[in-house]
């Protein structure tokens, strides 16, 4: 499972605010998209039990997030870590987890 840092990051991203140079953005659209995707996932289970849904959702959000941020920063891990609000070591660990190193 993910550590507490990841839980905090996802919580801030989905229910908090994102600080930018031009102000604060509330990511309601992201929250709504995740809610629709999870609802769709459960509707397709056809009565089967799901397991490890938390891990699945986090990895499905985290992997593309890391990919896009690394593209945005042109591979600059220090900038990417700062944008994510995590330290560079944590970023490197996450990139390795998803084979993005």
From Swiss-Prot:
Disulfide bonds: none annotated. It comes from the Bacteria. GO terms for molecular function: DNA-binding transcription factor activity; sequence-specific DNA binding. It comes from Shewanella denitrificans (strain OS217 / ATCC BAA-1090 / DSM 15013). Homodimer. Keywords: Activator, DNA-binding, Transcription, Transcription regulation. Belongs to the transcriptional regulatory Fis family. The gene is fis. This is DNA-binding protein Fis. Activates ribosomal RNA transcription. Plays a direct role in upstream activation of rRNA promoters. Pfam families: HTH_8 (PF02954). The keyword Metal-binding does not apply. Residues 77-96 bind DNA. PANTHER family: DNA-BINDING PROTEIN FIS. The keyword Protease does not apply.
């Amino acid at each position: 499972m993910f550590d507490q840092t990841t839980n905090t990051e996802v919580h801030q991203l989905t229910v908090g605010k994102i600080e930018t140079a031009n102000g604060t953005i509330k990511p309601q659209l992201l929250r709504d998209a995740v809610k629709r995707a999870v609802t769709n996932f459960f509707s397709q289970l056809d009565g089967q039990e799901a397991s490890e849904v938390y891990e699945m959702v986090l990895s499905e959000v985290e992997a593309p997030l890391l990919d896009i941020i690394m593209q945005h920063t042109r591979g600059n891990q220090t900038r990417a870590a700062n944008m994510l609000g995590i330290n560079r070591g944590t970023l490197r660990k996450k990139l390795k987890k998803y084979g993005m190193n």
